[in-house]
Amino acid sequence: MFWDAELRDELRGTELAAHLSEDDEAFDEDFETCRDALGEETANAMGLTLETFKAAASIAASRAFYVGGEYGECLVPCADLFNHRTGTNSVAVYGVEDDDDSDDSDGGDSGDTLVIKAVAEAKAGEELFNTFGEQSNASLLHKYGFCEFHNEDNVTVNLHVSLFEDVYGREKMHAVYDAMKVSLQSAEEERKQSLLDFFEAGKYYEITGANGVEDEFFALVEKIKDALVEVENKKVETNDVFEAIIDARLARYGAEAEDTIDEGGRPPAGGGVVGRQAAKLVRLQEMRLLNRVRQ
C-alpha cells in the first residue's frame, strides 16, 4: 500500500497499520536488489525508480495467479478480469496442478493450460466474480486495495502481550509471568507451553466476527488473573482483566470512528469501497467487533 501519511492515519489502531512500515522497508530492500542486479546504467535507461517499481509490484501482487508446477505465480491476461466478492463465486480457475484431477473430456485441459469455467448461472450483462478466499477487509485492502461492507464475519483483531503491558505495566507483567511459571509447573507440558508462549514466543490470540474470542484466551486471562492476585495481594476479577484488555485494544484506535460509512457514489468494479472510505470501514468494523465481545 503506497498511501501518504494522511491516509495511513485513517488506519490507526488497525491490524493493518502495523504492517505498513514493514512493507516500506521490504520494498526499499527489493528495489535496491533489482536495481543492483540491472546495474545503474540499465536501470536509469529503463526509468526504474522506487515509484515505478512499486507500481509494477502492486500490479503483480494484486493480479497474479498461482498457476502451479514450474510456472508458480503468473500474470494471465483475461484471467485477471474477475473481481472478488466474499460469498460469491461465478467462475473457477484451474491451473496445471489441477490437471491430474480433472475428469473433463471436452478438451483443452493440457499440462500448460489455465482453464476458467463458469460454476454458477449468470445473466447477460452481470459481473462475474472469482474468489480470493475468505479474507478480512484488512487483508483485502492490504493485498487488493478494496473492502466490502458485508464482510463482517471475517473481521479479525489480534490480542498480544503488549496489551497487558499497556494496562499493568511491563514490570508487573514480568512478575505475573514468573508467578505463572511456578503455578504451571505441575500442568501438562503441552498446555503449560501453550500458555507461556504468549510471553515467550510472540504468540497471540484472535477475535473474529464469526467465532468471537478464542477459548484459550479466556483460559490465559484466568491464569493471569490468578497471578495478579498473588502479585498485587488483592482481589482481582477475571472479567475485569478481560474488559481492561479489550479497552486497551480499543484505545489504540484513538478517537471514536464514524458510526457509518457513506455508501453513496459510484462503486468501483466489483462493488465495495476504496481509499479513505475503505480505511474507515476497516477501523469501524474492528472497533464494533471489540465492543461486541466486551458486552
Identify the role of each PLM range:
Residues 1-295:
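Long, positively charged leader/targeting segments at protein N-termini
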